[in-house]
């Protein structure tokens, strides 16, 4: 009788010494894992774009800081040079006036090495296509710079555009190394650096961020005045 009962129990017992309900417990655990993975994926889909936007905003804020430093450096230099920026002072007197027509940007920053202190402020963190310059001599070239300069900017002229992100559009002026801007010129930002947004620095060292549609308004270009931008 006992032998028959034992045989009956063994016949109904799962193979591999598994207790009843083990498979269902394992299946439930697998479902839990899949649900957890799905939840993590949803959270990541929500948070990652927000994190990317936060990083982009941080880089743009840092870029504004760079431009503020550039603007203040130009103003400091002008105090020691009869209220003129380097572009209006002869090379013989420590300026870069004779170099302005070449379209090169780096010489104008080189003469500001004392005021800028470090060449790192000439590179935007969002400018991943270019490497940050390490010194003001051998490593400072247009290929290391993130910012353009307006050759016609004047110290004391608040609305005068001084500098800005290099991803400005309409940069190709036929037969000239400089971009010529007058009132009504179509201007904007490319997708690079700040995703069709950008920062502008003015002669009074103020910095303004603007969207693609507002950049023309912020430039404040007056009728009859032409601004020549050297874009690296």
Which residue stretches match the model-derived regions?
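C-terminal accessory segments of extracellular proteins
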Residues: 173-232
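N-terminal leader/signal peptides at the extreme start of proteins
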Residues: 1-28
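Short catalytic/ligand-binding loop motif for oxyanion handling, primarily in non-cytosolic enzymes
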Residues: 78-79, 85-88, 94-96, 129-135, ...
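Acidic, glycine-rich loop-and-strand cores that form catalytic or ligand-binding grooves
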Residues: 119-182
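N-terminal single-pass transmembrane signal-anchor helix
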Residues: 21-55
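Conserved hydrophobic/amphipathic alpha-helical signal-anchor segments
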Residues: 45, 49-106, 118, 207
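Structural recognition of the beta-strand scaffold that forms the well-ordered cores
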Residues: 86-87, 121-125, 160-163, 199-201, ...
């Amino acid at each position: 009788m006992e032998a028959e009962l034992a045989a009956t129990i063994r016949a109904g017992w799962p193979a591999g010494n598994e207790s009843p309900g083990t498979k269902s417990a394992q299946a439930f655990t697998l479902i839990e894992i899949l649900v957890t993975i799905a939840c993590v994926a949803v959270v990541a889909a929500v948070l990652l774009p927000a994190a990317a936007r936060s990083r982009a905003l941080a880089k743009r804020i840092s870029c504004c800081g760079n431009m503020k430093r550039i603007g203040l450096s130009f103003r400091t230099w002008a105090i020691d040079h009869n209220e003129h920026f380097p572009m209006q002072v002869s090379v013989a007197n420590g300026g870069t006036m004779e170099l302005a027509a070449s379209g090169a940007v780096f010489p104008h920053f080189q003469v500001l090495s004392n005021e800028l202190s470090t060449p790192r402020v000439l590179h935007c963190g969002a400018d991943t296509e270019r490497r940050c310059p390490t010194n003001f001599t051998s490593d400072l070239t247009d290929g290391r710079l993130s910012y353009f300069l307006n050759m016609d900017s004047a110290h004391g002229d608040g609305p005068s555009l001084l500098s800005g992100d290099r991803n400005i559009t309409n940069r190709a002026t036929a037969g000239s190394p400089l971009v010529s801007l007058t009132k009504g010129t179509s201007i904007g930002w490319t997708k690079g650096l700040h995703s069709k947004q950008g920062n502008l620095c003015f002669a009074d060292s103020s910095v303004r961020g603007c969207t693609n549609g507002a950049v023309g308004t912020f430039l404040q270009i007056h009728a009859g005045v032409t601004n020549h931008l050297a874009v690296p």
